[in-house]
């Protein structure tokens, strides 16, 4: 029951109806005995800054921001964590003593998901894409000592990302399949595969993959994307994107509600059931 002591948080996006974050955070509030609520906050881009400051004034603990607000959120924040600065985007905001503090938990969530599956974060990683998610993932991998190769359909964007990160290597899109023989990790950080649309002949792209390659996708709708299915058919290890969603959310929940939630089977089962309902 919501009362005068309920701590409030939410997710700002446009659209935001698809977000599983309210389901997950409210589940964590229930199982941890937290007097809190997490709500969807559909926010038009033209009103983002005003809405963000209004939520801070209304007593919210903080918010997540999703498409298309992650970069706009950087400009609206009074302070950015070093991780957010490096990632070039914000997905988690805390309202502290009248200040808006932005963080990016995508990279940490991605790596925590790999670790939860006992995947070693080492060696050479091929990252597909040069957008906000790719930057967060690439930064986290570089900071953990990986060699990172970034492939993007527009080479200039990959080159700009490498320059911004101060590390890694940019390659043309057509080159990346031939480089997989020397990689231990392949990350799809693009929207290809969302909704089950392949967007690419993944089986052909994986022909040069080393037997020990781990293939992971940030897309989680569906959980088994065309890339992951193609990798499984070749006997490669795969990690789906749902765990990244769960692990990146934990830092925000900790900051807003003061409890460290568990990325347990119940949480995953709840989210998986929701995804099946919408399929």
From Swiss-Prot:
EC number annotated for this UniProt entry: 1.1.1.25
Superkingdom in the source lineage: Bacteria
Cellular component annotations (GO), alphabetically ordered: cytosol
Pathway assigned in UniProt: Metabolic intermediate biosynthesis; chorismate biosynthesis; chorismate from D-erythrose 4-phosphate and phosphoenolpyruvate: step 4/7
UniProt keywords, alphabetically: Amino-acid biosynthesis, Aromatic amino acid biosynthesis, NADP, Oxidoreductase
Reaction(s) catalysed by this chain's protein: shikimate + NADP(+) = 3-dehydroshikimate + NADPH + H(+)
Entry-linked Pfam families: SDH_C (PF18317), Shikimate_DH (PF01488), Shikimate_dh_N (PF08501)
GO molecular function: NADP binding; shikimate 3-dehydrogenase (NADP+) activity
Binding site for NADP(+): 129-133, 152-157, 218, 241
Subunit structure as annotated in this protein's UniProt entry: Homodimer.
UniProt record similarity statement: Belongs to the shikimate dehydrogenase family.
Function: Involved in the biosynthesis of the chorismate, which leads to the biosynthesis of aromatic amino acids. Catalyzes the reversible NADPH linked reduction of 3-dehydroshikimate (DHSA) to yield shikimate (SA).
Protein's name in the database: Shikimate dehydrogenase (NADP(+))
Species the sequence originates in: Gluconobacter oxydans (strain 621H)
Gene: aroE
């Amino acid at each position: 029951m919501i009362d005068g002591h309920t701590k409030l948080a939410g997710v700002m996006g446009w659209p935001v109806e698809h977000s599983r974050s309210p389901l997950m955070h409210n589940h964590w509030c229930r199982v941890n005995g937290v007097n809190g609520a997490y709500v969807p906050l559909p926010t038009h881009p033209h009103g983002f800054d005003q809405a963000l400051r209004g939520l801070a004034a209304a007593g919210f603990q903080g918010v997540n921001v999703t498409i298309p607000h992650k970069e706009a959120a950087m400009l609206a924040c009074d302070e950015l964590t070093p991780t957010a600065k490096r990632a070039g985007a914000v997905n988690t905001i805390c309202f502290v003593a009248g200040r808006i503090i932005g963080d990016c938990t995508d990279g940490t969530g991605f790596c925590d998901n790999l670790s939860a599956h006992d995947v070693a974060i080492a060696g050479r990683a091929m990252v597909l894409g040069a957008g906000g998610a790719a930057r967060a993932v690439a930064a986290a991998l570089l900071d953990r000592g990986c060699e990172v190769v970034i492939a993007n359909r527009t080479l200039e964007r990959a080159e700009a990302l490498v320059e911004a990160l101060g590390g890694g290597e940019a390659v043309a899109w057509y080159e990346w399949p031939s480089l997989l023989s020397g990689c231990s990790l392949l990350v799809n950080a693009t929207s290809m595969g969302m909704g089950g649309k392949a967007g690419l002949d993944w089986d052909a792209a994986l022909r040069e993959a080393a037997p020990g390659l781990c293939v992971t996708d940030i897309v989680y709708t569906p959980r088994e994307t065309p890339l992951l299915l193609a990798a499984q058919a070749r006997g490669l290890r795969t990690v789906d994107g749902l765990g990244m969603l769960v692990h990146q959310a934990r830092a925000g929940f900790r900051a807003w509600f003061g409890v460290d939630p568990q990325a347990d089977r119940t949480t995953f089962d709840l989210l998986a059931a929701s995804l099946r309902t919408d399929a």
